[in-house]
């Protein structure tokens, strides 16, 4: 039976049942496409399109993902491990591992969340084309050394230069030391952007619009042609909530109009503040990034929809970037498929003014916007990826042995 015929028949009722064939097909496709926990909240189903789910489940070429750029990925276990941990550092890592375990359904040792997990998650188990690997500081919680230093991120980039970009990191209260470190990262490590984190329990508070603390960092970026300043906003949990709000972004964006300020996690649950501050300041260089929010698509679907509608309406579809926060939420494959099938139901579009998420909008979010901000030529990047070993391994089904059988060894 052709796909067109199957779609035509899908709307009819199943004999002896009130369930339509469309509903049955959607259920089967949903189970094939979405993660197991997607079905824990029945109201989530209204946000997924039956035709899109069916096409994805059938591997229809029409449903193939666009060029995908993941703006937020991590390695949480640096090479050589950690010598000591403060209680806050230990809590931080256990929270990350516990979150991944809740998604994939099995325990995750913290030490497994290293470079190999990153490579496998991003490039062997997902459709991601380019991943931005985020450095991470918080030295006070991790034996006086960055949890994931920029130099290690740059080294991992060298393993797959066509697939990986690097975001550097500094701690703004470090003053001149932070400036010197950023100069080194720009000149020697060739970072593609800067990632900043709000203070935690063992660090000093700072603001994005502090002329003494952060503005010198922006001047370094400007001098070296690095245009993108990323910052963790929202999701306070492990950070001091006062600094996870967004009131400090608008002035910085206005004072540095040639830089882009990207609020990670869409500043959730403070996304309305983000949109309001950008609109009041009349700045066009504030963006939102979606990392770490995909599980809310199913666990609190109405709240996720409100968040996404707020940033799309408030900032514009051309100001929202795809990100997954991998590895915390597991391999990004399920997030990509879910977003491809996602949309706002008609009643929310009509009653609340939620925007229609067209295929063109999804292409913008999944990769087009990041490609524009980071000056990635999609055609050139695609040609390079086609020749990439990781891409070939994924297309070939990753035909590498998972285990070595010593009985097959032969003496040389």
How would you label these PLM feature ranges?
Residues 90-113, 120-142, 163-169, 192-193:
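Divalent metal-dependent hydrolysis catalytic cores, especially in the metallo-beta-lactamase
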Residues 47, 56, 192-193, 200, ...:
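Catalytic pocket-lining loop regions of alpha/beta-barrel enzymes
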Residues 108-119, 145-155, 211-215, 245-248, ...:
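Well-ordered, non-membrane alpha-helical segments in soluble/globular domains
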Residues 50-52, 130, 135-244, 287:
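Active-site gating/metal-coordination segments in enzymes
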Residues 72-78, 232, 265:
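Histidine-centered divalent metal-coordination motifs
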């Amino acid at each position: 039976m052709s796909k067109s015929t199957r779609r035509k028949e899908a709307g009819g009722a199943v004999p002896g049942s009130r369930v339509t064939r469309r509903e049955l097909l959607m259920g089967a496709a949903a189970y094939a496409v979405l993660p197991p926990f997607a079905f824990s909240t029945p109201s989530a189903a209204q946000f997924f399109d039956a035709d899109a789910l069916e096409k994805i489940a059938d591997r229809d070429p029409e449903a193939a993902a666009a060029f995908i750029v993941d703006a937020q990925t991590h390695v949480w276990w640096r090479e050589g491990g950690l010598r000591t941990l403060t209680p806050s550092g230990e809590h931080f890592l256990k929270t990350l591992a516990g979150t991944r375990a809740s998604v994939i359904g099995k325990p995750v040792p913290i030490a497994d969340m290293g470079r190999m997990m990153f490579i496998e998650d991003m490039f062997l188990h997902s459709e991601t084309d380019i991943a931005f690997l985020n450095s991470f500081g918080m030295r006070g919680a991790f034996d006086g050394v960055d949890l994931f230093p920029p130099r290690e991120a740059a080294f991992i980039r060298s393993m797959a230069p066509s697939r990986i970009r690097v975001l550097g990191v500094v701690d703004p209260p470090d003053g001149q030391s932070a400036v010197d470190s950023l100069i080194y990262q720009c000149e020697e490590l060739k970072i593609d952007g800067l990632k900043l984190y709000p203070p935690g329990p063992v660090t000093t508070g700072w603001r994005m619009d502090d002329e003494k603390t952060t503005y010198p960092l922006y001047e370094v970026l400007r001098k070296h042609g690095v245009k993108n300043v990323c910052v963790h906003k929202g999701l306070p949990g492990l950070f001091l909530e006062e600094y996870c709000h967004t009131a400090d972004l608008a002035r910085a964006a206005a004072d540095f109009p040639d830089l882009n300020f990207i609020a990670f996690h869409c500043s959730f649950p403070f996304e309305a503040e983000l949109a309001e501050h950008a609109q009041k300041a009349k700045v066009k260089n504030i963006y939102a990034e979606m990392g770490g929010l995909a599980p809310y698509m199913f666990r609190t679907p109405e709240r996720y929809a409100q968040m996404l509608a707020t940033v799309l309406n408030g900032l514009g579809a051309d100001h929202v970037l795809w990100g997954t926060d991998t590895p915390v939420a597991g391999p990004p494959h399920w997030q990509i498929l879910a977003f491809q099938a996602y949309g706002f139901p008609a009643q929310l579009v009509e009653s609340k003014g939620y925007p229609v998420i067209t295929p063109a909008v999804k292409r913008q979010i999944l990769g087009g916007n990041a490609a524009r901000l980071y000056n990635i030529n999609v055609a050139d990047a695609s040609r390079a990826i086609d020749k990439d070993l990781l891409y070939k391994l994924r297309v070939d089904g990753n035909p590498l042995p998972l285990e070595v059988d010593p009985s097959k060894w032969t003496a040389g």
